[in-house]
């Protein structure tokens, strides 16, 4: 499976990792990350956001490791998954392995369907169902996309997700 294993071995190093994904059809996506801190005063912030459709599955397994000599570490891990239909399935397994008390570490995980109140709000203002769902997905992913430093990449990602969501409508008709 795809793995991400940054090693924080220099004092005062900072890493911000962002990732988005979209699963459809019967895809199985397996993500594994390791944030390994072995030096003092390091910082890591990991944010995964995914959208699942059809019978796609995702599993995220993440581990923050903080060595005994890594005092002053700040490490954060977040995984959020948005299910577009009931047949999609997601599992998230965040873990902490901390050997030093002088740290700030946390992990968070959610798997949720499209918020029906958000959809209703948009539809009650004349937004068609499909467009409402696209807006919700784009809003969900915006935290990651807006943090990317290259505007052309942001535009490309938005176009890619628009294409995938448009294919979803064509497939369901």
Which stretches of residues belong to each language-model region?
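Single conserved hydrophobic/aromatic residue that forms the stacking wall/gate
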Residues: 1-12, 16
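Family-specific signature for flavin-dependent thymidylate synthase
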Residues: 24-28, 37-173
């Amino acid at each position: 499976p795809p793995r991400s294993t940054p090693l924080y071995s220099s004092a005062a190093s900072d890493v911000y990792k962002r990732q988005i994904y979209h699963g459809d059809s019967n895809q199985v996506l397996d993500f594994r990350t390791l944030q390994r801190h072995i030096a003092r005063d390091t910082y890591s912030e990991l944010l995964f956001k995914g959208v699942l459709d059809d019978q796609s599955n995702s599993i995220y397994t993440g581990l923050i490791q903080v060595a005994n000599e890594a005092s002053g570490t700040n490490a954060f891990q977040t995984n959020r998954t948005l299910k577009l239909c009931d047949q999609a399935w997601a599992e998230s397994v965040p873990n902490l392995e901390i050997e030093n008390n002088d740290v700030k570490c946390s992990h968070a995980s959610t798997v949720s369907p499209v918020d029906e109140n958000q959809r209703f709000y948009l539809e009650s203002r004349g937004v068609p169902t499909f467009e409402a769902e696209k807006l919700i997905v784009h809003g969900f992913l915006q935290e990651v996309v807006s943090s990317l430093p290259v505007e052309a990449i942001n535009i490309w990602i938005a176009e890619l997700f628009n294409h995938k969501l448009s294919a979803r409508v064509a497939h369901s008709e």
